[in-house]
Structure formats: C-alpha cells, structure tokens
UniProtKB/Swiss-Prot annotation:
This is Isopentenyl-diphosphate delta-isomerase. It is an enzyme of class 5 (isomerase). The keyword Metal-binding applies. Keywords: Cytoplasm, Flavoprotein, FMN, Isomerase, Isoprene biosynthesis, Magnesium, Metal-binding, NADP. One of its GO terms (cellular component) is cytoplasm. It catalyses: isopentenyl diphosphate = dimethylallyl diphosphate. Mg(2+) binds at E163. It comes from Rickettsia prowazekii (strain Madrid E). It is found in: Cytoplasm. Belongs to the IPP isomerase type 2 family.
Amino acid sequence: MPKEQNLDIERKQEHIEINLKQNVNSTLKSGLESIKFIHNALPEINYDSIDTTTTFLGKDMKAPILISSMTGGTARARDINYRLAQAAQKSGIAMGLGSMRILLTKPDTIKTFTVRHVAPDIPLLANIGAVQLNYGVTPKECQYLIDTIKADALILHLNVLHELTQPEGNKNWENLLPKIKEVINYLSVPVIVKEVGYGLSKQVAKKLIKAGVKVLDIAGSGGTSWSQVEAYRAKNSMQNRIASSFINWGITTLDSLKMLQEISKDITIIASGGLQSGIDGAKAIRMGANIFGLAGKLLKAADIAESLVLEEIQVIIEQLKITMLCTGSCTLKDLAKAEIMW
C-alpha cells in the first residue's frame, strides 16, 4: 500500500480515537444558550398531535435531524457507520458519511461507507472535502462516490482551518468556487456545502447560493474544534502551539444563523455545531434552520452499540416535541414562529 494511503488510514484512526477520548470542544459556545423560549402554560395542544415530520432531498423524515458526517475508511469506522445508519433508518432521520476521499485511492475501503442496504429509506449524504477539487478530484469522481453508496446528495465540506493545522493538510484554496460550480452542474444529485465547525458567513453563503448551492450546513463554532483535534495529533510542540491557538476561532452557530436569515428563503439550512439536545435543535429551527445536525454524542454511542444511538436519538426527539408543546407549536412551521426572548 502506498505510504500516502497508509497515512490517510492512520489519520482517520487518530481522529476517531481523539474525538472519543479527549476534550476537543471549542471554548466558544454555540450561542443558542442565549435564546429563551417564552413558556406557554396553556398551549391547547394534544401531545399526540405534535408533528415533527419534514421532507429533505425529496424524502420524508420523522424528525428534522441529521446525523452529521463523522468517519469512514477504517474497520472501526465501518462498525460506527453501520450502527448510525441502522439507527437513522429506524428513527426516520438523515445521515451524512465522513470524508470519502480515501475511497478514490483505496477502493477496498468501500465497505466502511456502504450503508444503504441497512438504511434504504433515509436521506444519505456522500462527502468529500471541497479543497480536493484543487488536488485532482474531478466531477466524475464525485459522481462515482454518489453512485457507489447510492447517496441522495454530495457534501462538499469547507475545512480550511482544519487543513491548515494539519502538517499534511492541503493549503491551496484559490479558484475553488468555479470548481464547486462545475460539480454542481455535473452531478445527478444536489450539492450541500458544509463548514466543519467554524461557521458560514453571509458573504460566503451568498457566493455559494449564486453558484447554485441549494443546501448549506453552517456548522458553526461551539462544538468540536478540529484545530484542537490536530493539536492532540501534533508531533512536536510547535505544531501543537499553532493548532491549539485556534480553539476559540470561528462564527458561532447562532451568529451564522442570524447572518443567513435574510438570504435563506429559497435554500435549505442545516444548523450544526455545538448542538447538544432537541431543545437546541428547536432554537435553531426558530432561528431559520430547516434541519439540525449532531455528531459528538452520537459518535460516542455508536462506538459502543446501536441501541445507545437509538436512545440518544429518541431523547433528542422527545426534547424537541416537549419544547414544541411548551411553546404552543403543533408543527415545525409553528415552531419557526414561536415567541422567544434574549
């Protein structure tokens, strides 16, 4: 096996291990904690009539939840992805896969990503770093990733800070937008552009929408800090000092949502980054999101058992439904207009 492929697998293994064992959270909070719903003591709604259903990528979902992209490429990642996918299928929610670049150079990693057979009905998202378009990945190869796992969309993730704090990271980020547009025009499915924990600004969102992007995952600061993950991976003190200095970098999830409010009418917004509960998810929907994503706590559960993932998802859904009832919101559209205070 070429040395570069070995390094890719080693890096993915280290990422899982560090995320499970170390505190890699940003020192920033998501900002959602500053929002308070106005409690409705007389909601006049039957709990059984609360409707959390929605549609995403043409598929029905029982709740507006995305299992955010995490991993792939290793045996441990295969088990994690299978458990996440099975739980997503049973819960009626969406799932994103981790970066699939390794599949283009190491085809035998395919089993770590192919989960459609255990999750036939869910919105399933393929995933690759957008910067890879500057390093030889073609629109045709992006379509190959989609076809291989029977995905409903392709995530192009923007992870500039993560790449720059990796010793082996990709540093050429020029002229990327035209290449993203090429992929959008070539593919048979929609493209989702996603940050990885540092937020999307209004200016960047406008550029992406103009290029044809219909779904944005803001992935704001407040959750996992990938620069902090790289600080733990650092092989020397200099690398550690550089990476760890960015632990409070980024646009918080709430600030990113507020920036995108006036331009989000015709696109789908996924809110992720530091969300910890269905209450946080409800706040994100109130601030303009259509769907909310979580990763960290589901990763920890999926490393152990599918039943724990199912339990976490059920807790999140129940928190969402209780929040809806306590704000007098029968549907997600009602929740998006619920009274709040700061």
